């Protein structure tokens, strides 16, 4: 995590330090190279808008996957460590790019008595989109046919449907909705700890979800969740469709 923070040129917060926006990277942005590139895109957009952004010097995992896999004690230990670390610094809001971290910190830490002001980065970027560089707000769609995949933790759990779509549309992209979208969207198959389970090819949820995108002739599947990004990318590779469709983070 410290290495990713240095790579992104992010200021780290020691106890007593202060920032406007505390960026909670999460494990995917810290350790996965592709999500790390999405993190860089977000950080560059925030900087271009003049946002004071910093990370915890001792950020740890939010604990969500431990709880989903039944390790409640481990989850609570991780949560308490994060809560203590967050309580030692000053900030106006927390922003994270992972819906799993977002839901955990916003709702499940509240079960432990800690109520945090947390935003998903799609919400945050939407709130400052008028301050973003014109180039970021007016990309050309080219010949791509773009569809947006709703993450379970953004959509059904937190009703964040419009913000990611507004960001894409403000970038000059025209969206084509899949048959199952918004509240009726299909899971990518990575939630509930299933990211770490091996599933027979004919039973893979991510393959079925990819078929929804292929059915509307999408050439790009956009998403705002690192789990969904990985699961849909795996489906593209396992079904040999890399020459027909790709998956990209909205940043």
Positions of predicted regions on the chain:
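Iron-sulfur cluster-binding electron-transfer modules in prokaryotic oxidoreductases
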Residues: 1-251
């Amino acid at each position: 995590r410290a290495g990713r923070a240095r790579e992104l040129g992010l200021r780290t917060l020691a106890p007593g330090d202060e920032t406007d926006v505390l960026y909670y990277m999460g494990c995917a942005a810290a350790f996965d190279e592709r999500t790390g590139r999405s993190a860089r895109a977000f950080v560059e957009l925030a900087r271009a808008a003049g946002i004071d952004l910093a990370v915890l010097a001792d950020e740890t995992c939010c604990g969500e996957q431990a709880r989903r896999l039944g390790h409640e004690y481990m989850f609570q230990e991780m949560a308490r460590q994060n809560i203590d670390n967050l309580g030692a610094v000053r900030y106006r809001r927390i922003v994270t790019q992972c819906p799993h971290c977002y839901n955990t910190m916003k709702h499940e830490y509240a079960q432990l008595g800690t109520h945090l002001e947390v935003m998903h980065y799609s919400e945050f970027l939407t709130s400052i989109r008028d301050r973003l560089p014109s180039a970021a707000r007016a990309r050309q769609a080219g010949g791509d046919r773009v569809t947006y995949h709703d993450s379970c933790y953004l959509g059904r759990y937190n009703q964040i449907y419009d913000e990611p779509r507004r960001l894409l549309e403000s970038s000059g992209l025209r969206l084509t909705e899949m048959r199952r979208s918004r509240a009726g969207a299909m899971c990518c198959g990575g939630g509930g700890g299933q990211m770490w389970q091996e599933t027979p090819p004919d039973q893979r949820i991510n393959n079925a979800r990819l078929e929804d995108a292929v059915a509307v002739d999408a050439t790009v599947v956009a998403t705002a969740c690192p789990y969904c990004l990985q699961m849909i990318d795996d489906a593209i590779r396992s079904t040999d469709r890399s020459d027909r469709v790709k998956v990209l983070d909205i940043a």
